[in-house]
Design a protein with these regions (language model features):
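Predominantly soluble domains enriched in secretory-pathway, periplasmic, or organellar proteins
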Residues: 1-180
């Protein structure tokens, strides 16, 4: 990017299969991609998050973290010490053998360029969207089928479900937060 011009530098990165979302850490040192697997969604098999070293010349994939079946939404906290991958877990495919009523979050600790899965948290039906509040104290997860958002509390790398939700008039497939 130079001013108002964007050029393709012909740098393709071999992320995992079907990369769906990309999130860049606030430090600008790493990016994460949600690799949804062979089906491009939930298929009963585990999938990964690719870790991209943006400081390497050229940037490259330095790790993959197994997160669960069908990572879709992806968010990194404002401090950059924790991320979440929204896991479909079969919640989009009721007749399938791998169906689960609810999806989950894979909570990922970020320490420099090392990313580690630390726990899973169950959320609602077909979760897709995730965003941290600007102050980093809360995380909102959009549950598409339930037409609501789960509200989770964030304390450092510890994320817990408050048990509270708020309804929306549509199906939350994505979400963004603004500082104002």
């Amino acid at each position: 990017v130079a001013g108002d011009k964007v050029t393709y530098e012909k740098l393709d990165l071999p992320t995992g299969l079907w990369p769906f979302n990309v999130a860049v850490a606030p430090s600008g040192k790493i990016a994460l991609t949600a690799d949804s697997g062979d089906a491009g969604g939930s298929d009963g098999s585990v999938d990964t998050i690719s870790v991209v070293d943006l400081e390497a010349q050229p940037p490259r994939i330095v790790d993959r973290v197994v997160v669960g079946d069908g990572p879709e939404g992806l968010a990194i906290s404002p401090k950059g010490d924790v991320a979440v991958a929204v896991i479909l877990a079969g919640s989009n495919n009721k007749p399938a053998y791998f169906y689960h009523r609810n999806g989950s979050l894979a909570v990922l600790r970020i320490d420099g360029k090392k990313v580690t899965k630390i726990k899973d948290i169950e959320v609602g039906g077909l979760p897709e969207a995730a965003a941290f509040t600007p102050d980093g104290r809360y995380l909102l997860v959009g549950n598409y089928l339930d037409q609501d958002f789960s509200i989770l509390r964030v304390n450092g790398t510890n994320i817990t479900d408050t048990g509270k939700r708020f309804k929306v008039p549509g199906h939350p497939a994505s979400v963004r937060m603004s500082p104002r």
